[in-house]
Regions:
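Alpha/beta catalytic cores of nucleotide-metabolism and tRNA/nucleoside-modifying enzymes
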Residues: 8, 12, 18, 23-24, ...
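Active-site beta-loop-alpha junctions enriched in small/polar residues
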Residues: 17-19, 42-44, 72-74, 99-101, ...
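Alpha/beta enzyme core
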Residues: 31, 80-110, 118-195
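N-terminal small/glycine-rich loop or linker at the start of catalytic domains
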Residues: 1-13, 45-68, 100, 104-108, ...
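Glycine-rich, positively charged N-terminal anion/phosphate-binding segment
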Residues: 2, 17-92
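Hydrophobic faces of well-ordered beta-strands that scaffold small-molecule active sites
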Residues: 12-16, 37-39, 67-71, 94, ...
């Protein structure tokens, strides 16, 4: 799959997620087969005001390329200037956010609010595309609400503006992340434009991904919440695309090793205090569905140092292995 002049190793992308898709997590997903990773959304105004924390979000490691930086805002001139900054900083692709449903973003006329203003969206995308040489992409929703499903119209305008690819989340802004994604909207977008289309929404397994490709005809898959705590979904999907249909069951030890590694990467990237704070949430996602997960998620939220994290993980490993061994013995006796 190709976006402009950027060749992807696989037609599977990591969706931008605030508080999740920072550099460490993007590297992990890339190592597990993801073809394109996208940053957390970055404020165009923050870049223009030279905010240090905002500029930190532009950092890209060589091993995660190709990588896209996602911008948000609503002022065409500001976004064009911000796009130039992102390009100069070394991004491979610039993505534009038209999907965020959060009130503080929408109330500023940004994110999914732009689904209600097609002409402004077109002007923004045209100015961004004209201002840089690297590909510009956009992520949209099905529409504002069920009475205003306009993703195909927005997609056509985006293509006209010079956008190189488009990702479509099959939910409206009104839905947030509730209910079901309407994959038929993704199909209509694919039928409307010639540029590559990523389908997004309700892809939690490889089977979901294969079904979306078949039902919508989309060119690629964009995985968001399905990768949260489960970056192995990229390996599973790529294996499925290559003909292996079995679900990849991630062993407990592999999950715990990933938590340890992710914590170390966060520490190296952001320092121990922030790393531990952010890893509480990540660890909870990694442990979802594991034995005694609820109890240990609660205890993880009380941790303050990497040393405490390591000690609790060692305790959990021992207790979980005992639990699984006892369960195995019980099942053997029952047979």
């Amino acid at each position: 799959m190709q976006i402009g002049n950027i060749r992807l190793s696989a037609p599977v992308a990591l969706a931008p997620m605030a508080g999740i898709t920072d550099m460490p997590f993007r590297i992990i997903c890339k190592e597990l087969g993801c073809g394109l990773v996208v940053s957390e959304m970055v404020s165009a105004k923050g870049l223009l005001y030279k905010n240090v924390k905002t500029f930190d979000m532009l950092r890209i490691a060589q091993e995660e390329r190709p990588a896209a930086i996602q911008l948000f805002g609503s002022n065409p001139m500001e976004l064009a200037r911000a796009a130039k900054i992102v390009e100069a900083d070394g991004a491979d692709i610039i993505d534009f956010n038209m999907g965020c449903p959060v009130p503080k973003i929408v109330n500023n006329g940004e994110g999914s609010a732009l689904m209600k203003n097609p002409q402004l969206a077109y002007e923004i995308l045209a100015r961004m595309a004209d201002s840089v040489k690297i590909p510009v992409t956009v992520k949209i929703r099905a529409g504002w609400d069920e009475k205003n499903i306009n993703a195909p119209k927005i997609a056509l305008l985006a293509e006209k503006a010079g956008v190189a690819a488009i990702a479509v989340h099959g939910r409206t802004r009104e839905q947030y992340y509730n209910g079901k994604a309407d994959w038929n909207v993704i199909k209509k977008v694919k039928e409307t434009v010639k540029i590559p289309v990523f389908g997004n929404g309700d892809i939690l397994t490889a089977a979901d991904g294969l079904r979306m490709l078949k039902e919508t005809g989309c060119d690629g898959l964009m995985i968001g919440r399905g990768a949260d705590g489960n970056p192995w979904i990229f390996t599973e999907i790529i294996n499925a695309l290559n003909g292996s249909c079995g679900k990849y069951e991630v062993p407990l030890d592999v999950r715990l090793h990933m938590i340890e590694r992710h914590l170390q990467m966060l520490k190296d990237f952001k320092g121990e205090v922030i790393a531990v704070k952010e890893m509480r949430r990540h660890a909870g996602a990694y442990l979802k569905g594991m034995p005694m997960a609820a109890e240990y998620r609660r205890r993880i939220n009380e941790l303050n140092t990497c040393e405490e994290f390591g000690a609790l993980l060692r305790e959990y490993r021992n207790e979980a292995e005992k639990f699984l061994a006892a369960k195995h013995n019980f099942c053997s006796e029952a047979d």
